[in-house]
Regions:
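Flexible glycine/serine/alanine-rich "lid" or loop that lines and gates the nucleotide-sugar donor pocket
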Residues: 77, 127-128
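Glycine- and Gly-Pro-enriched alpha-helical subdomains that act as flexible
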Residues: 87, 108-121, 127, 133-137
Length: 180
């Protein structure tokens, strides 16, 4: 029986096929003053990545009518270290346009929260204004994890590695990540 992650990855493969060959022009976007890592180090305490999420496969609809721009402004005004924007539509009802809109109004780092399985998704995230991308260890084999991690770093993006167990943590630690 397929897991939710399996179903999501099937959809991501379809999405990647549509994205391949496209070019993503980075528009003039508001840049964060500091990286997420710099913010955390300067605060010398745990930082908060505040999330904009309309829905999830496990919870269903969470906040279908959320205005990502207003939510981002509220998060930034209340001390969020970064903002996570769900960009997956089929399962989370987010979009890359949400990320673009948020980037226009805040100057803190933005995490593109999606199921990244290909470099083209990283290119799209960067062009939309993301400063951080998410790599989920459970969704990638070691070779792909390393390839995408290194590519994102080459693009001057921060990488948040998501792990759910000790085995995934060991796999991710071989990359010497700054954010787990």
């Amino acid at each position: 029986m397929a897991t939710i992650l399996d179903k999501i990855l099937v959809e991501k493969e379809k999405e990647v096929k549509k994205l391949i060959g496209q070019t993503f022009n980075q528009t003039a976007v508001r840049k964060p003053k500091k990286t997420f890592k710099q913010i955390i180090e300067e605060q010398n305490k745990m930082g908060v990545i505040a999330e904009i999420k309309r829905a999830s496969p496990s919870k269903g609809t969470i906040n279908a009518d959320v205005d990502p721009v207003q939510q981002a402004i509220t998060y930034a005004a209340n001390g969020a270290s970064a903002i996570s924007v769900l960009t997956d539509y089929p399962f989370f009802k987010g979009s890359i346009d949400d990320l673009k809109a948020v980037r226009e109004v805040v100057d803190i780092p933005i995490l593109c929260k999606d199921f990244i399985i290909d470099k083209v998704q990283i290119d799209r995230a960067k062009a939309a204004g993301a400063n951080i991308i998410l790599l989920i260890a459970a969704a990638l084999d070691d070779t792909k994890l390393k390839e995408l991690y290194e590519y994102a770093k080459e693009q001057q993006l921060e990488v948040l590695c998501e792990v759910h167990d000790e085995e995934a943590m060991e796999r991710v630690l071989t990359l010497k990540p700054e954010i787990v």
